């Protein structure tokens, strides 16, 4: 049986009969910018299913898995949630860096040695510090962080083993000055583009390269146009899960707590699925004739050395407390 919105429902205590006003379901519209089969979309559905199982007809959960299908840009999800058109959505944190520059600290290259370290940071003090800053300057409640994961460079020109191989290449990057600067330091020409614009440019051959987790590269069909894929692991990016603040704050406490619990569960689910998606994407790339370049230790060191100036620049850009959390 579905529980009521009160916190007592979680303890199995009976609830008073709802009034006629309480019988009107709370509408929750979740949205994203990927096919319904992606881990992000499946995680949204998992959240919604959990809420519906708990609250029954007290909630009305609907989904718009891919706003691109409706003619929107990927970055439109920011205002769609902030204005309350969508109740909940996700987007790469890089899209917030113009409004909240401190968020760009997690765009710095090579700051996490592995996935476990990155997850611990985003679930811990670093994630809490970013949440505080985002909520202070937006109309969101941040409820968690999906894993977009480590990113790799793909291109249609040549295999990339060293920074010298990137010299002169045009590469699409997320809307982040830190990311753009990173690729300038390795000799490439970064182009900040929204996803829809970038996909058009890639298909037309107007840009040489892009960077994404392998799963995204395959989801968006980029592997059909890019033969070469280098495992650079240069950025680790998260996707904040944000909720329209006025809606969330107006909800009964029980529903607020239930959503946060549903997000925690969905994040764990999505992260586990992400590992599988990366493995499957690599297999797809190889099966369709793509080449995956695994960098040697020395080749990776060359990239780290090339971008080293960015850490000194970061000390003049970002708050000291954030840098300290990254040991910078």
Where are these regions (language model features)?
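A gly/proline- and charged-residue-enriched helix-loop-helix capping module
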Residues: 113-134
């Amino acid at each position: 049986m579905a529980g009521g919105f009160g916190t007592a429902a979680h303890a199995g205590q009976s609830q008073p009969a709802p009034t006629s006003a309480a019988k009107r379901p709370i509408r929750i519209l979740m949205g994203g910018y990927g096919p319904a089969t992606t881990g992000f979309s499946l995680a949204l559905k998992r959240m919604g299913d959990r809420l519906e199982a708990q609250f029954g007809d007290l909630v009305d959960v609907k989904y718009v898995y891919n706003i691109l299908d409706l003619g929107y840009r990927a970055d439109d999800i920011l205002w769609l949630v902030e204005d309350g058109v969508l109740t909940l959505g996700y987007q790469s944190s890089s899209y917030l860096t113009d409004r909240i520059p401190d968020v760009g600290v997690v765009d710095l290259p090579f700051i996490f040695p592995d996935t476990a370290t990155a997850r611990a940071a985003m679930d811990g003090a670093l994630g809490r510090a970013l949440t505080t800053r985002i909520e202070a300057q937006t109309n969101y409640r941040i409820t968690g962080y999906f894993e977009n994961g480590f990113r790799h460079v793909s291109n249609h020109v040549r295999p990339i083993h060293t920074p010298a191989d990137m010299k002169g290449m045009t590469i699409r990057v997320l809307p982040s000055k830190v990311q753009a600067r990173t690729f300038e330091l390795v000799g490439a020409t970064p182009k900040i583009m929204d996803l829809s614009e970038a996909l058009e440019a890639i298909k037309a051959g107007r840009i040489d390269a892009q960077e994404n987790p392998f799963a995204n590269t395959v989801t968006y069909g980029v592997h059909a146009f890019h033969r070469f894929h280098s495992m650079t692991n240069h950025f680790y990016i998260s996707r904040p899960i944000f909720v329209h603040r006025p809606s969330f704050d107006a909800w009964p406490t029980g529903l607020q707590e239930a959503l946060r619990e549903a997000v925690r569960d969905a994040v764990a689910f999505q992260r586990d699925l992400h590992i599988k998606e990366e493995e499957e994407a690599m297999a797809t790339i190889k099966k369709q004739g793509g080449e995956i370049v695994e960098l040697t230790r020395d080749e990776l060191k060359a990239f780290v050395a090339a971008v080293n100036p960015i850490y000194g620049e970061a000390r003049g850009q970002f708050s000291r407390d954030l840098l300290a959390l990254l040991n910078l």
